[in-house]
Amino acid sequence: MALPDFTMRQLLEAGVHFGHQTHRWNPKMKPYIFGDRNNVHIIDLAQTVPMLSRALQVVSDTVASGGRVLFVGTKRQASEIIADAAKRSAQYYVNARWLGGMMTNWKTISNSIQRLRKLDEILASEASGFTKKERLNLEREREKLNRALGGIRDMGGTPDLMFIIDTNKESIAIEEAKRLGIPVVAVIDSNCDPDQIDYPIPGNDDASRAVALYCDLIARAAIDGIARQQGASGRDLGASEEVPVEPALEEASEA
């Protein structure tokens, strides 16, 4: 395995270079702006390329050392893409709504995850002795918890790295990451504050094709990290008769 390749052409075709209207910009983004066209800022892809490459390396290194990556994107055009990318790369995600304290109050979140697991057990049992109405209420509670916490139910603790689409919308997630010292990889559009981000990627954070490209590359970088971690163990885990227990799952079961 190797880090995923990408080209300037791919970035252009996905519309990564299109920022927002010039009057909506954040002046801190000036170093990453190439110019403007029809009152829309054009992001300097000559800077995006190396910064995206650096972000991919960080993701791969984090996973290779046994770390967990949390994908965060709750806006409509990112929600499904974020979840798919995280699942494909055996990572974790928040794609519905960021609950305040999701990282900084992990104990409370863990209790809610335990409740979600309990509801799964209860509803899987046919002989649970509930009325139709009681069962319906339990199903609704499970659905609500699963929508909020389904993507982190097996995370087993706070992540080692966060990848974020739309830093303005996910400002609370970024604040919590900062408080806990969790590094953040994020796409920064022309209306964002780059100072808040450890590994910024200048680019459009609204176009579905651009979001899909970032998520695909980050997911593939995480998969590269998994391959490196397995290679470092000196054996082919896929060929083993006994597959080792994933530490994150082990921690989650103990939580």
Swiss-Prot record:
The keyword Isomerase does not apply. It comes from the Bacteria. GO terms for cellular component: cytosolic small ribosomal subunit. InterPro entries: Ribosomal_uS2, Ribosomal_uS2_bac/mit/plastid, Ribosomal_uS2_CS, Ribosomal_uS2_flav_dom_sf. Keywords: Ribonucleoprotein, Ribosomal protein. It holds the Pfam family Ribosomal_S2. The keyword Ribosomal protein applies. GO terms for molecular function: structural constituent of ribosome. Residues 232-255 are annotated as: Disordered. GO terms for biological process: translation. NCBIfam families: rpsB_bact. Belongs to the universal ribosomal protein uS2 family. This is Small ribosomal subunit protein uS2. It comes from Sinorhizobium medicae (strain WSM419). The gene is rpsB.
